[in-house]
Regions:
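Conserved phosphate-binding/catalytic loops in two-lobed NTP-binding clefts
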Residues: 150-165
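Active-site metal-binding loops of divalent metal-dependent hydrolases
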Residues: 13, 138-140, 162
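Conserved phosphate-binding catalytic cores of ATP/NTP-utilizing and phosphoryl-transfer enzymes
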Residues: 1-6
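Conserved ATP-utilizing enzyme core subdomain
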Residues: 26-114
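Short beta-strand scaffold segments in enzyme catalytic cores
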Residues: 15-20, 38-39
C-alpha cells in the first residue's frame, strides 16, 4: 500500500519520515511536533491546536524561530532520533526564554516544524521530480501545519482518509 509513495511522513509527537531503499525501510526523526504544540495548547486549556487555528491567527517570532532552526540536531545526517528528554532540556528552555504569548509560541513552533520538515524532504530529494509523501499521525489533522509544510517543500503531500491517519 505504501510503496506507491516515495516517503511516509508521520506527524505525531515527533515528525519522522521513512522510505524504502532496496527493500529495506529506513526511518529517522526530523523534529518535535505535537509533543511541543500540545504542551502549549494544554496551557491554554485545550488538548491541541485544532486545525492550527491558534497558529494561523498569531505572529511568528522571527528571533525565536531562527534560534530553534539553528539547533545542531538539524545539521546531523540521518538516521537520527529524538526523545522527550531533548524537548525538555533543549526546546522548551529556549522557547520559555522568550517573553511572548503562548499563542505566539504555538505559531512560531508550528512554523519551525514546517520549515524543518520541508528542509528534510527537500534534502532527501534524489531527482528533479516532485516526491509523493503520505502524511499520517495526529498532526495530519492540523491543516495550517500541512499548508506551511507544503509552502516549504517541493513534494506533493497526500492525506489519506481519517481512519488511516
Amino acid at each position: 500500500m505504501f510503496k506507491s509513495y516515495d516517503y511516509c511522513l508521520n506527524l505525531g509527537g515527533f515528525a519522522n519520515v521513512s522510505q524504502e531503499v532496496n527493500d529495506v525501510r529506513l526511518a529517522y526523526d526530523i523534529c518535535p511536533v505535537n509533543t511541543v504544540l500540545n504542551f502549549y495548547a494544554n496551557i491554554k486549556g485545550l488538548p491541541y491546536d485544532d486545525n492550527g487555528k491558534i497558529a494561523s491567527q498569531h505572529p511568528v517570532n522571527t528571533k525565536l524561530l531562527n534560534e530553534l532552526n539553528a539547533l545542531s540536531f538539524y545539521d546531523k545526517r540521518p538516521p537520527k532520533s529524538l526523545g522527550v528528554e531533548w524537548v525538555n532540556h533543549t526546546i522548551l528552555p529556549i522557547i520559555e526564554s522568550y517573553n511572548i504569548s503562548t499563542e505566539e509560541k504555538i505559531a512560531t513552533f508550528t512554523e519551525h516544524c514546517a520549515q524543518q520538515i520541508g528542509k528534510s524532504l527537500n534534502n532527501t530529494k534524489t531527482s528533479t521530480n516532485s516526491l509523493d509523501v503520505l502524511v499520517t499521525g495526529g498532526g495530519a489533522f492540523n491543516g495550517w501545519l500541512i499548508d506551511r509544510i507544503s509552502n516549504h517543500c517541493n513534494s506533493k503531500l497526500h492525506l489519506p482518509d481519517d481512519e488511516l491517519i
